[in-house]
Amino acid sequence: MAKLKITLRKSAAHRLPEQRKMVKEFGLNRVNSSVIKPDDAATRGVIFKLAHLVTVEEIKD
């Protein structure tokens, strides 16, 4: 299964509380921090909500 590298590009400060919570639960602590997550529907849903804050790269296994 493919994986996604998600990088926080903009700060979550001054965003909606729901968006700040999603960023924190995703494991993104600071700007330019990255996490690798599986490419599934739940991950894609969070990325859709945070599209203006993150960049996504696909990693092939």
Curated annotation (Swiss-Prot):
Pfam families tied to this protein: Ribosomal_L30
Keyword tRNA-binding included in the entry's annotation: no
One GO term describing the cellular component: large ribosomal subunit
Any one GO molecular-function label of the UniProt entry: structural constituent of ribosome
GO biological process, alphabetically ordered: translation
Keyword Protein transport found: no
Record keywords, A-Z: Ribonucleoprotein, Ribosomal protein
Record-stated family: Belongs to the universal ribosomal protein uL30 family.
Subunit architecture: Part of the 50S ribosomal subunit.
HAMAP family: Ribosomal_uL30_B
NCBIfam families recorded: rpmD_bact
Name of the protein described by the UniProt record: Large ribosomal subunit protein uL30
Organism lineage string: Bacteria, Bacillati, Bacillota, Bacilli, Lactobacillales
Gene of this entry: rpmD
